[in-house]
Regions:
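Bacterial N-terminal signal peptides that target proteins for export
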Residues: 1-9
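C-terminal motif of bacterial Sec signal peptides marking the signal peptidase cleavage site
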Residues: 16-20
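Conserved functional acidic sites
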Residues: 22-27, 32-260
Length: 260
């Protein structure tokens, strides 16, 4: 899965409430205050690592209304992605009015994620998501293609839950709490990502606006253990800011959002 706040001393900053105030500006964030954040109980059931986790396909829906990443068909997010060398890419994420039956029996919503550089497609991905009866947002796989000079180069990173041992994961819990740690995706040797929630009162300023009371995650991968990313999800919008805080300095910031 493709991932990418401004880092201060290698740490994202966070603060306090959940609305977007219009306007533009540079991407930034502020340090956890400690007040307002709740701690996850040890019994919270979420999938971790490569451990089996029972799911019932009949309890899933493609009508995704998780407050921290609602996916109504037609919704679109546009990001500016800047890498360590200063190269800028445009990322457009669109929720399609299409679904896919995943190999593990779950019907998933298809989300198109396209990265362009200098007007040329650099990466083209179809991600698959579904929501369970409790409101947890699940990630069930992706069909991704990287391009070089306008031609397909590799499909490395593609996977589907239920195929060749691949397992689905959580992208956003129904009731996110500080301390929750969960698997986002698992396909041994290809996609082994996880996340921990480190704040529920994060503040983010991006070109699209100012967001308070965001959920902030720390994202990691067993395949690239030196790379750590952090993300902020705003209520009613989804991801608004992503940055690599260790092993790189990539940054994604939300430029625009339109609800379907």
């Amino acid at each position: 899965m493709r991932k990418a706040i401004l880092a201060l001393a290698g740490t994202l900053l966070v603060s306090l409430t959940a609305a977007a105030c219009g306007g533009s500006g540079s991407a930034s964030a502020t340090q956890p205050t400690g007040g307002g954040a709740t701690t996850a109980p040890a019994t919270t059931p979420l999938p971790v690592d490569a451990k089996p986790f029972p799911i019932d396909p009949s309890e899933f829906t493609t009508e995704i209304d998780n407050p921290y990443w609602p996916m109504k068909p037609g919704s679109q997010w546009v990001f500016r992605e800047t890498d360590a060398e200063g190269s800028v890419s445009r990322v457009v994420v669109t929720v399609l009015d299409k679904t896919k039956m995943i190999a593990n029996g779950v019907e998933a919503r298809i989300v198109h994620d396209q990265v362009t550089q200098g007007g040329q497609v650099a990466e083209d991905t179809y991600d698959w998501y579904a929501q369970d009866a409790d409101g947890n947002l699940w990630y069930l796989g992706e069909d991704t293609t990287e391009y070089e000079n306008g031609k397909p180069k590799t499909k490395e990173g593609s996977w589907e839950a239920g195929v060749d041992g691949a397992l689905p994961g959580i992208i956003m819990p129904a009731s996110p709490q500080v301390g929750m740690t969960y698997r986002e995706e698992y396909y041994k040797g290809h996609a082994e990502d996880g996340a921990s929630i480190i704040s529920t009162d994060a503040l983010a300023k991006v070109p699209y606006g100012r967001f308070e009371n965001g959920v902030q995650t720390r994202n990691f991968s067993a395949i690239e253990p030196d790379v750590i990313e952090e993300k902020i999800y705003a209520q009613g919008v989804g991801v608004v800011l992503e940055i690599t805080v260790s092993g790189g300095s990539d940054r994604d910031e939300l430029l625009s959002y339109s609800e379907g």
